[in-house]
Amino acid sequence: DTGISGRTAVIVGERLYSVARSRQVLSITHLPQIAAFADCHLFVEKHSDSEKTKTSLRELNNAERSAELARIMGASAADESAQKYASELIESANRFKLKVNELD
């Protein structure tokens, strides 16, 4: 998703969702417009000490999903408008998915 943003990123998210309806899709993105279409968000964390680097993976709940989308937009955890926009992105993606599924 390098070099895209805005409406183009939303279209990519819609297309990825269309593919994901019949196949498993694993996507790594820093675009909230694409991430909003995910059915499941996994958060990757790295922990390093002087000898090793460990990577952990955990599934985010709904509140964490919105917070993470706001974070990748560059907002702080206290930024209510970014949190609201992140929630709206997820809601919009869910409406799109519901509409597509109703067509079946």
Task: Go through each PLM region and give its residues.
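C-terminal lobe/lid and adjacent interdomain/linker elements of RecA-like ASCE P-loop ATPase modules
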Residues: 7-104
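Short loop immediately C-terminal to the Walker-B catalytic DE motif
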Residues: 1-2
